[in-house]
Amino acid sequence: YFDMAEIAWNNAGTMLAYTCKPLTGTAYAVSTDSDIFVYDLESGATQNICKPTNFNTGKPVNDQAAMVGYDKYPVWSPDDSKIAFLSQRRAGNESDKARLFVYDCHTAEMQDLTADFDYNAQNVVWSGNDLIYFIAPIEATHQICRVAPSVGEVEVITRGDHDINAFTMAGERIAAEMCTISMATEFFEINPEDGSLAQISAINKSVYDNIRMGEVQKRWVKTTDGKQMLTWVILPPDFDPSQKYPVLLYCQGGPQSVVSQFWSYRWNFQLMAAQGYIVVAPNRRGLPSFGQEWLDQISGDYSGQNIRDYLSAIDDVAREPWADRERMGCVGASYGGYSVYFLAGCHEKRFKAFISHCGIFDFDSMYGETEELFFVNNDYGGPYWDTANATAQRSYANSPHKFVSKWDTPILIITGEKDFRIPYTQSLEAFTAARTLGIPARLVAFENEAHQVFKPQNSLVWNREFFGWLDKYVK
């Protein structure tokens, strides 16, 4: 998935830096090893700056083993003397830490500016030749940070419960796109000295003036292994703590994709809350913005600690007097859809209904169907035929389809027929199993959608089916 942001002219217009994954066949399918190349328009020469070789000997001149993951998004310094880019260390692991590297075009030296910073870097912008600004996901938010290559110490500029998704700079002024769970994207100006925010646009003010939003609470939940997990709890508008409300457990996809302060018309927490539901959205194991150890834990352990994290979150909220534990549902997409399928076989009567969108149901068939072979190798531990691989065999032994005999709860299954990430046949398998077992089940297949539902009319249908199912079996 390379886009035009991965092609960068130098400021003099004489060189072009770009991302390329110079692999073919099986190697292309099982590896994420892309590199940054620089093309000189005058000489016609191309250089791989991530794996440079000596011109005379053809031998590598740096540690090749350190640059075998994704290397992406080159950005030239204003004087064209350096190139900043993002780099992942491990081949095949698309969720490895995104390190911020700087390449010196004169000396060919590499510098990792985020070696001591346990978060990903993204959206890199130079400020002059000696300072770099970037966005980092930190504790389920997205903040602007900066680092000077000469110092190498990252400074977090902004604070607060928000997602800064993109920004641009003019001199010392920063204009950024920002959203929250309760606000679609608007433009803000950011003071780089103190990180203060000043809203510039108010495109949806007339809409917000005529609707009510629910309160968003930040809740730290103790997990079964004694750690603290940040969980967003979104309450219905006009919430009355003396009343009881139905509760939804939201299972995040990815699986390495943060439950942040994102705003989406596809999975909108405020829209769910507006229907009278309390939404519980945990940042379970495997999600970024809490350090690489927290994120890495999920690989090879899909059925383990992160599932217990889900249950810790919903059980914690269910103990509140305003949460109706007799009216709880569980929803999710992609890996979240897998989570729904797995929980359907082990939830011990917690939930009254499930909704799975494009979820993984059968690990064996999924391995041979997905277009991301490097992903299943990394996250499952390997192929199903590798009987000597204990991690892989544990993954396949705990595939949701192995526990279908324990299903007993109504389930809505949604899929896109053009999904090649988690092919729609996974949803067909799950639907067939549920209906054969006599469990109330409904299949909604969009013939012109892929892994997500993007078309506006289809989105209306999706929401109608989503809330119709919950209202029937949960509310």
Each language-model region and where it sits:
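Residue-level recognition of a conserved intra-blade site in WD40 beta-propeller repeats
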Residues: W9, W76, V125-W126, M169
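Short substrate-entry loop that stabilizes the transition state in hydrolases
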Residues: D240-Y245, Y250-F290
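Active-site-proximal cap/loop segments of hydrolase catalytic domains
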Residues: N268, A273-A274, A281-K475
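A flexible loop/linker signature enriched in serine peptidases of the S9 family
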Residues: Y1-M4, T19-F37, N48-V75, L86-F101, ...
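Short loop/turn segments that connect beta-strands within beta-propeller blades
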Residues: D40-G44, D104-A108, A148-G152, N191-G195
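Non-catalytic accessory segments flanking enzyme active sites
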Residues: A5-N11, M15-C20, E155-Q243, S260, ...
